[in-house]
Swiss-Prot record:
Name the record gives this protein: Large ribosomal subunit protein uL30
Keywords of this entry: Ribonucleoprotein, Ribosomal protein
Family annotation (Pfam families): Ribosomal_L30 (PF00327)
GO molecular function, one term: structural constituent of ribosome
Disulfide bonds: none
Gene Ontology terms describing biological process: translation
Entry-linked InterPro entries: Ribo_uL30_ferredoxin-like_sf, Ribosomal_uL30_bac-type, Ribosomal_uL30_ferredoxin-like
Membership in a protein family: Belongs to the universal ribosomal protein uL30 family.
Assembly and oligomerization: Part of the 50S ribosomal subunit.
Database matches in CDD domains: Ribosomal_L30
GO cellular component: cytosolic large ribosomal subunit
Organism: Ectopseudomonas mendocina (strain ymp) (Pseudomonas mendocina)
C-alpha cells in the first residue's frame, strides 16, 4: 500500500488567496474540521506546503 498523509482543514479559506483556496479544494477538503487521506506524492506535498497555515498534517 502506498504511503498516505492525513490532512485536516483547521482554518477558514474566506479571504485567502485564490490559489491557496484552489490547493485546499484540490486536496478534497470542504469544511473546517474535514479530514482526508491523500497519497504522499510531490504534487500533494506541494499543495500542502502552499496552504500549510490552514491545515494540520499527520503522517
Amino acid at each position: 500500500m502506498a504511503n498516505t498523509v492525513k490532512v485536516t482543514l483547521i482554518k477558514s479559506t474566506n479571504g485567502r488567496l485564490a490559489n491557496h483556496k484552489a490547493c485546499v479544494k484540490g486536496l478534497g477538503l470542504r469544511r473546517i474540521g474535514h479530514t482526508v487521506e491523500v497519497l504522499d506524492t510531490p504534487e500533494n506535498r506541494g499543495m500542502i506546503n502552499k496552504a500549510y497555515y490552514l491545515l494540520k498534517v499527520e503522517g
